[in-house]
Structures are given as C-alpha cells and as structure tokens.
Amino acid sequence: MTVNAKTSPSAGNTWRDLPAAQQPEYPDTEALRAVIADLESYPPLVFAGECDQLRARMAAVAKGEAFLLQGGDCAEAFDAVSADHIRNKLKTLLQMGAVLTYAASVPVVKVGRIAGQYSKPRSKPTETRDGVTLPTYRGDSVNGFDFTEAARIPDPERLKRMYHASASTLNLVRAFTTGGYADLRQVHAWNQDFVKSSPSGQRYEQLAREIDNALNFMRACGTDPAEFQTVEFFSSHEALLLDYESALTRVDSRTGQLYDVSGHMVWIGERTRQLDHAHIEFASRIRNPIGIKLGPSTTAEEALQYIERLDPEREPGRLTFIVRMGADKIRDKLPELVEKVTASGATVAWITDPMHGNTYEAASGHKTRRFDDVLDEVKGFFEVHKSLGTHPGGIHVELTGDDVTECVGGGDEIFVDDLHQRYETACDPRLNRSQSLDLAFLVAEMYRDQ
C-alpha cells in the first residue's frame, strides 16, 4: 500500500473556476490560504490502496453480490471525539452488519459517516432569533453552534481541527476493528442482549437463534477463521468544503492518479450536485468511490449525465446513487431512474437514504423523523427493485450508538413528548441505538423476501 506523499500543484483544483454552492464566506482570506498550505503538507488520513479496496467492494454491491451499510452522525462534533462516542457508534454498525450479513447471505460492506462529517449544507445562509440575525451554523468545521456573533464567524482554523479530529477518530476505529473488539462472536452476544431486552425482541428471536446455531456449528467443527476476529471498515463523508477536500487531494505514487485522502469514499449532496458546478467537477477528478444524493426532483436524464461525467469508463464500484426521495415519493420517482440507468448499461450501486426525505418539525419545535416513515421508504426501495429485477444495494442512515430521543417511534418507542429528554444532535435527528438495530432486523426480513 502506498503513502500518497506527492501533491501536484494543481491537483484537484480545476473546480476553482466554477460556481461552488454552500461554501463559507471567510472574512480573512489570508488566514484561509495559510490553513490550506498547512493541510497540503499534512499526511493522508487514508491510503489510495484502501480507496481501491472499497471500490472493489462497491463493485460487488453494484453487481448484486454484496450489500452496503453506511451510517453515522448527521454532523460530527469536535466535543464528541471520545472513545465512548466512537465505540458506541461502531458497536451499533457492527451489530447491524452481523444481522444483515446472515440474513442476506452476502458480504456487508461497512462504511461509516465518520471521521470527516463535520460540515453541513444549509437551506438558509442566516438564522434569526429574537430579532438578531447571524450566519447559520454550518458544522464544527466552519463555525460554532452557540448563537453568538463570535461563534458564528467562519474560522478557517477549524479546518485543521477537522483534520485532527478525523485522524483521532480513524486511529481509534482502526484499533477497534482489528484489535479484537469487533470479533463476530462478541457482536452476536451484543445482539442477543438486544433481542432479550427489546420490546420487539420476540420478532427477532428466530433470526438471532439461527445465527447462534450457525456459530455453534462452526465452533463444533473446530473452525475459527481469522475473519471472525477483525472487520473491514471504511470512512466516508460529504465532500462539501472544497478548500479542505482539494488540500487533501494527493497524487498516488503507484499510478499517478488523484485521490482525496480525507476519506475512503465521498459523496456529493442534494444541494451541491449541479452538473456544471464545482462539486461535480472536483468529484470527476478523483479516483475515490463517489456517491451522489438523488432527491425527488432528479430526472433520469440528470442521472445519465452524472454517469457520463463521473463514470465515463463504466467501472462498477465507481459510482453510487444514494436515493433520498421521502416515503411518499419513492415508489413513484425511483422506477424510471432505475429503468433508464439499467438500460444505459451502466452498473451503479443503488442505495436508499430513508432519512432526509422524511424530516418534519414537531409541535415542540424539534426537527424529527418518524421511524415508520424511515422504514416505509426502505420498504418502497426494496419493492421497486424487486419489481424491476434489480439489486437493492444498501442503506445510508443517520444514527448514533447513544440512547438519544431524536426520532419518534421504534420498538422501544420514543414519543413526541420525549424529544426534549435527550435531543443532542447538532443538526438533523438520528436513529438511536435501539431504533438502528430495529431497522437492521427489519431490513434483514425485507432482504430475505427479495
């Protein structure tokens, strides 16, 4: 595996000539330039060879030979870079992955919204409270959450804090996933505890018992594969702040190709996917696996143009369409996209994001999501693919390993009146640990019905 040491002066900077949506307006451009220069000198957070490995795994997803589980915080926070937070999030994803692997009988590619998800696009540039108007909070990588003038000024030094927070997180994730913490038998024991304590546990008991029997059978045969003790885990985030992403773009010394070494996979969001704008241009220059969020306004023509721009060689594993339609629209909007893309001969991975199209404001003023809506969008996604004979490639979920109260519903039900108890998100509502595991068991049932 190669350390991407060399940086081309113009590496990944062609986007600078194009309009770039959702970029912060820094008051001190000299300070920004100094930060970019520092970032360009920093070591890579991931290696090109690892990005290629994920491309190969995503190719299997696109061909129907694997399933993607992508999840993590809506927006990471600097003050949440702690062993407990990271471990709980990873534990939840590993538990979900174990259930899905057994039920689907295909490898589950595990990718975190982690170690870089510190920025958020916003619908409005400013926020007004009690007659005071300040810049919107855009994530810890841009400005502070506190509603004060000082906190809300975009500060380029935060880009360096994002790099260091991401490095700390990745270091711990690598230790957990290779040091025995991710052992499959341990993960299964956690799932058994969940099944026992969950109000929905009875529904999941059969599947948990089957997994138990399979593990007991292997143990009786004297089988103890090394794969049981470690897990492959990749990082991903939205490539939103182009100054940061391009500063961490390197030339791979093996191939001469450009890689964004801030994460294994990056995606372009619904608000920044304009074909003739900077984000798509940046994504077209790097070799990482790329995701594109597709909302309900996406046309089949646009989807085909993304393929032309981002995957001209038609390489499975390069491009992932992350569909975020809303539970009430997925069954109407998705079929044409899948049909036209499939007819074009392109092999892309189709993933459902059942979170972003299902947000509403509760009477209390909290942004929330109904677990039943999230589940219904996933159901619609599976139904569409089943009817077309195509592969439902995976799920992309905003979740936490903590017992927060941000989304309503679930087996261990959260009510609207409970939202205030532990509403901790910096931006959008996340599924808590129990709701995430509920979702995994229910998606496992759907996959079996395919």
From Swiss-Prot:
Annotated EC: 2.5.1.54
Gene Ontology MF terms in the entry: 3-deoxy-7-phosphoheptulonate synthase activity
Q: Which InterPro entries match?
A: Aldolase_TIM, DAHP_synth_2
Which Gene3D superfamilies does the protein's record reference?
Aldolase class I
Catalytic activity field: D-erythrose 4-phosphate + phosphoenolpyruvate + H2O = 7-phospho-2-dehydro-3-deoxy-D-arabino-heptonate + phosphate
Q: Which terms are listed as keywords in the entry?
A: Amino-acid biosynthesis, Aromatic amino acid biosynthesis, Transferase
Q: Which GO terms describe its biological process?
A: amino acid biosynthetic process; aromatic amino acid family biosynthetic process; chorismate biosynthetic process
Disordered as annotated region, ranges: 1-20
Q: Name one Pfam family in it.
A: DAHP_synth_2
Composition-biased stretches (Polar residues) = 1-13
Q: Disulfide bonds, which pairs?
A: none
Question: Its annotated pathway?
Answer: Metabolic intermediate biosynthesis; chorismate biosynthesis; chorismate from D-erythrose 4-phosphate and phosphoenolpyruvate: step 1/7
Question: Which family does the record assign?
Answer: Belongs to the class-II DAHP synthase family.
* Summary of subunit composition and partner proteins: Homodimer.
* Protein name in UniProt: Phospho-2-dehydro-3-deoxyheptonate aldolase
